[in-house]
Each structure stands twice: as C-alpha cells, then as structure tokens.
Amino acid sequence: GAGPAWESAIRSAAVDDGFLARNLPMDEAHVGWFLTLDPENPSSIRRCLECARSNGRAVRTSLTLETWEAVNDAWHEVQRFGTTIPDSTTLVRIADTIKDALLMFDGAAHRTQLREATYWFLRLGTTVERADNTARLLDVKYHLLLPRTEPVGGSLDYFQWTTLLRTVSALTAYRWVYRESVKPWLVADLLIFNRAMPRSLIACLEDAVWLLDQLAASRGRRGPANRIAANSLRALANSNIDTLFQSGLHEFLVEFVGENNRLGNAIAEQYLF
C-alpha cells in the first residue's frame, strides 16, 4: 500500500527526484520495482549490478576467480527475475537474493583478494557507500517517517526504530550493547559513535582513513581525500550523542552526507576515476 514507509525507502536511497519525475504511484509495487528491477533508474539493483559486472570485467585480471564469480552470479540471479514484480513475495525473494549475493561477494573478496590496491579500493568504495546509507536511513527515520499524529515513543515509533535496526542488521548488536528497550538516542549512538559497530559513521570514517593511508603508502603520496577523511573523523571523535541532539541531529546528518559526498569526489579525483 501507499504511505510514509515507501516514501522513506525512496528518500533513503536518495532517488526521490527521479521517482517523482516518473509520475509513479508511491506504493509497494512501484517503489519496489523502481528500486530493484527498473532498467532506467541508475540506482536500481539491476543497474548497480550491471555496472559492477562491467567494472569487474574491466579489471578482471586483478580479481580472483571467486570474487569475479560472486559478481557475475549475482547479476545472473537478478536477471532471472525478469523486469516485473508480480507480488510481495517476489520482492522479498529479490531482497533476500541480493543480501545473500552481497555476503558472498564480501566473503570472497575478504578471503581471496591480495591486500593491495584492488582490495583497498573495493573496501573504500564499500565504506563510503555504507556511511552514506547509514546516515540517510537515520535521517529518514528521525526527520520524516513518524506521522505527526503519532507520539514519539509510542508503539509505531518503537516499531520503526526496531525496523531500522533490523534493516542494518544491528538489532542483536543493540541489545548486546545497551541491554534495554529500543530508544531513539541509543540507536543513534550505536549507528554514529560506536566504533565496534561496523556500519557506524565513526567506524566507516576510521576504515576510510586507514584504507586511504594504505593507498598513500603504496603510491607514495597523500592528497585531499586523506585530509577530508582525517578531518571528518577528528570532528566526529570530538563529539557525542548529547551534543548532536542539542545542536540538531537532522542538521548533523545532512552535513555528514554532504561531507561524505565530498570525500567520494575527492577520492575519484585523487585516483583519476
């Protein structure tokens, strides 16, 4: 059905302008198709896998057989779904297929790739994208998702924060770290400041700084990307969740996404992508 949940899915993927330009209904069938199988949406899963496969072919000799097969198999799996999504069950199957494929790719790269530039660039791209995704998901939930008629801390609010944790595979981690019911400020603390949480913003920045350091050491020079990543990490390390809520979590997340985009552009320019 239609509703804020599907609008939030579009916004968290940062494709709301593209979706609205197509004049499609904001419902499960159309949003699900747009985000997964739409060949005209450059951010759809289908298009992302096509790009990944094309890029993989271009650097095929630097990928292990296992890493290449993980990418190629994922592309073939999605192709089998065709171009339409007949029902909710199919949408769930697509999502599960992609999650399995991503885990397979991560595992193959981690276990088989040489620790040199190819691997570091793979991890760096993942890290920048992960930080962007975490920040956008947090902002959508905090700033947009709860209807004005619903109370903060009510059953719907609790359900939505729990769903967010499930979305980023962090519900078990949350319970392990905080050992209490789901609270918005603790979810934000986990996904922003907890260094042990792999997809937290600070963990992503630490990874980015380390990976850029490895590339700098191997290539003999540092550049703007190293400075941007280090400055962003330093600023976040000197803050805390209380400060962010007082100054405005939404404003912080918008600024973080912008700075993260600047980092991505600096990496592309520094290494001539």
Name each model-derived stretch.
Residues 1-273:
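Alpha-helical transmembrane segments and their helix-helix packing motifs
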